[in-house]
């Protein structure tokens, strides 16, 4: 599994013009926007490992984690994170897991974050989403497990 993690001061996601998720950390605080990609070999153990890594990664103020600060998290699936761009000018999506594999694992990742104590908002799997964010720093990390 792969996660693109961004430290944000706010983030929201809209589907068909309707807001389906929003995080607004307390004034001066941060949250995380996490875009998640799934490949064919991923499983529930990797989803749980990725959730722990994201929740405890010390990328917020004073080298603290989202867990330390109870920072909110917005999660959205993004199959394009699995793109292979090494050849030609057209990305290959063959590494991206199909919906029947990917959707339950994104749900598992989100559930694992909640079990760890995170306040989690989500996008809608497989839908065209408009994501708005204020990236602070900027701080953007790519995490593979």
Swiss-Prot record:
Protein name, entry field: D-aminoacyl-tRNA deacylase
PANTHER family: D-AMINOACYL-TRNA DEACYLASE 1 (PTHR10472:SF5), D-TYROSYL-TRNA TYR DEACYLASE (PTHR10472)
Motif Gly-cisPro motif, important for rejection of L-amino acids, chain ranges: 137-138
Compartments, as annotated in UniProt: Cytoplasm
Domains: entry comment: A Gly-cisPro motif from one monomer fits into the active site of the other monomer to allow specific chiral rejection of L-amino acids.
SUPFAM superfamilies on file: DTD-like (SSF69500)
Gene name of this polypeptide: dtd
Family of this protein: Belongs to the DTD family.
């Amino acid at each position: 599994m792969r996660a693109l993690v961004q430290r944000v001061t706010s983030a929201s996601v809209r589907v068909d013009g309707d807001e389906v998720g929003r995080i607004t950390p307390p004034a001066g605080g941060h949250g995380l926007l996490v875009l998640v990609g799934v490949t064919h070999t991923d499983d529930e153990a990797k989803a749980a490992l990725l959730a722990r890594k994201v929740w405890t990664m010390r990328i917020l103020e004073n080298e603290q984690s989202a867990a330390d600060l109870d920072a909110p998290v917005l999660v959205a699936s993004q199959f394009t994170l699995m793109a292979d761009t090494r050849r030609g000018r057209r990305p290959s999506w063959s590494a991206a897991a199909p919906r029947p594999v990917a959707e339950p694992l994104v749900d598992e990742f989100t559930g694992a974050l909640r079990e760890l104590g995170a306040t989690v908002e989500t996008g809608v799997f497989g839908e065209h989403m408009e994501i708005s964010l204020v990236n602070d720093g900027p701080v953007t990390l790519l995490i593979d497990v």
